[in-house]
Amino acid sequence: MLQMLIAAPNSGSGKTTVTIALLAALKARGLNPCAFKSGPDYIDPMFHRSVLGVESHNLDLFFSKPQIVQNLYNKSAADHGAAICEGAMGYYDGLGGTSDIASAWHLADTLNLPVLLVLRPKGASLTLAAQVRGLMSFRTPHHIAGIILNDCKENLYRILAPVLEKETGVPVIGYLPPMPKAAIESRHLGLKTAGEIENLQKKITLLHETMKKTVDFEKLFSVFACPAPKVPKEEFPIPNVRIAVASCLLYTSPSPRD
C-alpha cells in the first residue's frame, strides 16, 4: 500500500498543489486513494474532496491523543490502495511556532509515515541540499524518504535532482513545472476555498496530466510502499446517531470528525 505524508520547509512551497496532483494521479490509476490533513485546517480538505469526491480526514494531535489519531488513520485508510496526508506549515512547526508538538513531523512520527518533502527552488540550488540535511538532522527519526521539486523548470530539475540525491542520500522522485493556468490563488488567510476558485476541475486535470509526465511513479511506489494499517477494534461501540451539521459558504470550518 502506498502511504506518505507530504511536507515542506515552509508554507507556500506547494504542498496542496502536489497533494491534489498526486491524489488525482492515484485515482486515475485505480488505487482508490484516501486523504488526510495534519491539524484542524478546513480549506485543504476541500481540495482533497474536490479530487476524490469523498471527505478528507483531519488528524489533530492537539485535540486528540496519539492512539485516537492512529486508530482514526488506520480505520479510514483501510480498504484503500493509497493514503496521502498533507502536512501544515513547515515540517517541524507545531504549537505556538516554538514546539514540534502537533506539527507535521509529530504526525509522521506518530503514524510512522514516510515523508515526501516538497522543495520550491526559487533563488537557491545547492543550498537546498543543506536545507534538507538540516531538516534530517533536527529530529530523530526524521522520516524524510523522498523529494519532489515544485515550480521547477525541466532544465533546472535535470541539474538539481542528481546533486540533491548525492548530497542528501534522499531520492528525488520528480517535479512539477511552473503552471500559471493551474495556480491555486491565495489571500491573507492562506489559500482560497475550493468553491471560490474558477475552473478548479480543469486545474486539477492539468496538474494530473503534467505529473504523469514529470514524476517517476515506479520510483514513488518503491520508496513509499508500506504495510497496510490494521483496523482497530472498537472497544466502546457507539450506536448510530443521526446528527445534522450546517454547511454553507459562511460556515465551512467543521471537519467530518467533529
Q: What is each stretch, according to the model?
A:
Residues 22, 26-27, 164, 257:
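Hydrophobic alpha-helical packing residues
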Residues 115-118, 173-175:
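Short hydrophobic alpha-helical runs that function as membrane-insertion/retention elements
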